[in-house]
Amino acid sequence: MAKKNSKTKNNDNTIARNKRASHDYHLEERFEAGLELQGWEVKSLRAGKANIADSYIFLKNGEAWLLGATFPPLLVASSHVVCDPMRYRKLLLNRRELDNLVGKVERQGYSIIPISLYWKHAWVKISFALAKGKQEHDKRADVKDREWKVDKERMMKHSVR
Protein backbone atom coordinates (compact mmCIF):
# COMPACT_ATOMS: atom_id res chain seq x y z
CA MET A 1 0.00 0.00 0.00
CA ALA A 2 1.41 3.37 -0.99
CA LYS A 3 2.14 5.92 1.68
CA LYS A 4 0.01 9.05 1.49
CA ASN A 5 1.82 12.30 0.95
CA SER A 6 0.95 14.56 3.87
CA LYS A 7 1.90 17.69 1.93
CA THR A 8 -0.81 17.27 -0.68
CA LYS A 9 -3.84 18.03 1.47
CA ASN A 10 -4.12 19.96 4.70
CA ASN A 11 -7.03 18.63 6.78
CA ASP A 12 -6.85 21.52 9.23
CA ASN A 13 -9.64 23.96 8.39
CA THR A 14 -8.21 26.77 10.49
CA ILE A 15 -7.62 30.03 8.64
CA ALA A 16 -6.20 32.14 11.49
CA ARG A 17 -5.60 31.83 15.24
CA ASN A 18 -5.26 34.38 18.00
CA LYS A 19 -2.36 32.81 19.90
CA ARG A 20 -2.07 35.68 22.37
CA ALA A 21 -5.64 35.29 23.62
CA SER A 22 -4.93 32.59 26.20
CA HIS A 23 -1.80 34.41 27.33
CA ASP A 24 -3.47 37.79 27.88
CA TYR A 25 -6.93 36.69 29.07
CA HIS A 26 -8.70 34.15 31.27
CA LEU A 27 -10.92 32.48 28.64
CA GLU A 28 -14.14 31.25 30.20
CA GLU A 29 -17.12 30.50 27.96
CA ARG A 30 -16.63 29.73 24.25
CA PHE A 31 -19.01 30.48 21.39
CA GLU A 32 -19.16 29.96 17.63
CA ALA A 33 -20.65 32.39 15.12
CA GLY A 34 -20.84 32.93 11.40
CA LEU A 35 -19.46 36.02 9.69
CA GLU A 36 -21.18 38.29 7.18
CA LEU A 37 -18.55 38.63 4.45
CA GLN A 38 -18.22 40.19 1.03
CA GLY A 39 -17.04 38.21 -1.99
CA TRP A 40 -13.49 39.56 -2.04
CA GLU A 41 -13.11 38.66 1.66
CA VAL A 42 -14.06 35.04 1.00
CA LYS A 43 -11.48 34.87 -1.79
CA SER A 44 -8.87 36.30 0.55
CA LEU A 45 -9.75 33.75 3.24
CA ARG A 46 -9.54 30.89 0.73
CA ALA A 47 -6.00 32.08 0.00
CA GLY A 48 -5.32 31.93 3.75
CA LYS A 49 -4.74 35.65 4.23
CA ALA A 50 -6.27 36.75 7.51
CA ASN A 51 -5.09 38.15 10.82
CA ILE A 52 -7.24 38.22 13.98
CA ALA A 53 -4.39 38.77 16.46
CA ASP A 54 -5.34 42.32 17.52
CA SER A 55 -9.08 42.02 17.03
CA TYR A 56 -11.98 42.05 19.45
CA ILE A 57 -15.75 41.85 19.36
CA PHE A 58 -18.04 44.60 20.56
CA LEU A 59 -21.80 44.77 20.96
CA LYS A 60 -23.78 47.69 19.55
CA ASN A 61 -27.55 48.04 19.09
CA GLY A 62 -28.13 44.37 19.88
CA GLU A 63 -25.64 43.16 17.27
CA ALA A 64 -22.11 41.74 17.57
CA TRP A 65 -19.33 43.21 15.41
CA LEU A 66 -15.77 42.03 14.75
CA LEU A 67 -13.29 44.90 14.83
CA GLY A 68 -9.58 44.89 14.11
CA ALA A 69 -9.46 41.74 11.99
CA THR A 70 -7.45 42.21 8.81
CA PHE A 71 -8.39 40.42 5.60
CA PRO A 72 -6.03 41.85 2.95
CA PRO A 73 -7.59 41.83 -0.54
CA LEU A 74 -6.06 39.80 -3.34
CA LEU A 75 -4.59 41.78 -6.21
CA VAL A 76 -6.86 40.11 -8.77
CA ALA A 77 -10.10 40.19 -6.77
CA SER A 78 -12.88 42.74 -7.04
CA SER A 79 -11.73 45.66 -9.15
CA HIS A 80 -15.18 47.32 -9.03
CA VAL A 81 -15.58 47.41 -5.22
CA VAL A 82 -13.52 49.40 -2.75
CA CYS A 83 -11.86 46.83 -0.48
CA ASP A 84 -11.40 47.93 3.13
CA PRO A 85 -9.34 45.25 4.91
CA MET A 86 -10.13 46.67 8.37
CA ARG A 87 -13.91 47.11 8.06
CA TYR A 88 -16.34 46.04 10.78
CA ARG A 89 -17.79 42.58 10.15
CA LYS A 90 -21.13 41.50 11.57
CA LEU A 91 -21.31 38.26 13.55
CA LEU A 92 -24.32 36.03 12.94
CA LEU A 93 -25.73 34.93 16.30
CA ASN A 94 -29.13 33.96 17.68
CA ARG A 95 -31.02 36.52 19.75
CA ARG A 96 -30.67 34.30 22.84
CA GLU A 97 -26.87 34.16 22.42
CA LEU A 98 -26.69 37.91 21.89
CA ASP A 99 -28.76 38.60 25.01
CA ASN A 100 -26.51 36.29 27.03
CA LEU A 101 -23.40 38.10 25.76
CA VAL A 102 -24.85 41.56 26.40
CA GLY A 103 -25.71 40.63 29.98
CA LYS A 104 -22.27 39.26 30.77
CA VAL A 105 -20.33 42.04 29.08
CA GLU A 106 -22.31 44.92 30.60
CA ARG A 107 -22.95 43.55 34.09
CA GLN A 108 -19.99 41.30 34.81
CA GLY A 109 -17.21 43.17 32.99
CA TYR A 110 -16.20 40.54 30.45
CA SER A 111 -14.53 41.19 27.10
CA ILE A 112 -15.22 39.17 23.97
CA ILE A 113 -12.04 37.92 22.32
CA PRO A 114 -11.78 36.01 18.99
CA ILE A 115 -9.82 32.76 19.26
CA SER A 116 -9.83 31.27 15.77
CA LEU A 117 -11.24 31.68 12.29
CA TYR A 118 -11.99 28.47 10.38
CA TRP A 119 -14.00 26.76 7.66
CA LYS A 120 -16.97 24.63 8.67
CA HIS A 121 -18.16 22.95 5.49
CA ALA A 122 -18.51 25.90 3.08
CA TRP A 123 -19.04 28.53 5.78
CA VAL A 124 -16.52 30.72 7.57
CA LYS A 125 -16.96 30.53 11.34
CA ILE A 126 -15.29 32.39 14.16
CA SER A 127 -14.70 30.93 17.59
CA PHE A 128 -14.64 33.48 20.41
CA ALA A 129 -14.71 33.49 24.18
CA LEU A 130 -15.89 35.58 27.08
CA ALA A 131 -12.68 36.66 28.76
CA LYS A 132 -11.30 38.66 31.66
CA GLY A 133 -7.90 40.29 31.36
CA LYS A 134 -4.95 38.75 33.17
CA GLN A 135 -2.77 40.78 35.48
CA GLU A 136 1.02 40.56 35.22
CA HIS A 137 1.32 38.23 38.22
CA ASP A 138 -1.24 35.87 36.64
CA LYS A 139 0.88 35.67 33.49
CA ARG A 140 3.99 34.95 35.57
CA ALA A 141 2.18 32.20 37.46
CA ASP A 142 1.11 30.59 34.18
CA VAL A 143 4.69 30.61 32.89
CA LYS A 144 5.89 29.13 36.19
CA ASP A 145 3.27 26.36 36.03
CA ARG A 146 4.14 25.57 32.42
CA GLU A 147 7.87 25.36 33.21
CA TRP A 148 7.19 23.13 36.23
CA LYS A 149 5.10 20.80 34.07
CA VAL A 150 7.95 20.47 31.55
CA ASP A 151 10.50 19.85 34.34
CA LYS A 152 8.23 17.27 35.94
CA GLU A 153 7.85 15.41 32.63
CA ARG A 154 11.62 15.50 32.16
CA MET A 155 12.23 14.08 35.66
CA MET A 156 9.66 11.33 35.13
CA LYS A 157 11.24 10.42 31.81
CA HIS A 158 14.71 10.08 33.36
CA SER A 159 13.49 8.24 36.46
CA VAL A 160 11.87 5.50 34.35
CA ARG A 161 15.22 4.63 32.72
UniProtKB/Swiss-Prot annotation:
Keyword match Phosphoprotein: no
Lineage of the organism: Bacteria, Pseudomonadati, Pseudomonadota, Gammaproteobacteria, Alteromonadales
Gene Ontology terms, MF aspect: RNA binding
Similarity annotation: Belongs to the SmpB family.
The protein's name: SsrA-binding protein
Species of origin: Psychromonas ingrahamii (strain DSM 17664 / CCUG 51855 / 37)
Compartment list: Cytoplasm
Cellular-component GO terms for this entry: cytosol
Function: Required for rescue of stalled ribosomes mediated by trans-translation. Binds to transfer-messenger RNA (tmRNA), required for stable association of tmRNA with ribosomes. tmRNA and SmpB together mimic tRNA shape, replacing the anticodon stem-loop with SmpB. tmRNA is encoded by the ssrA gene; the 2 termini fold to resemble tRNA(Ala) and it encodes a 'tag peptide', a short internal open reading frame. During trans-translation Ala-aminoacylated tmRNA acts like a tRNA, entering the A-site of stalled ribosomes, displacing the stalled mRNA.
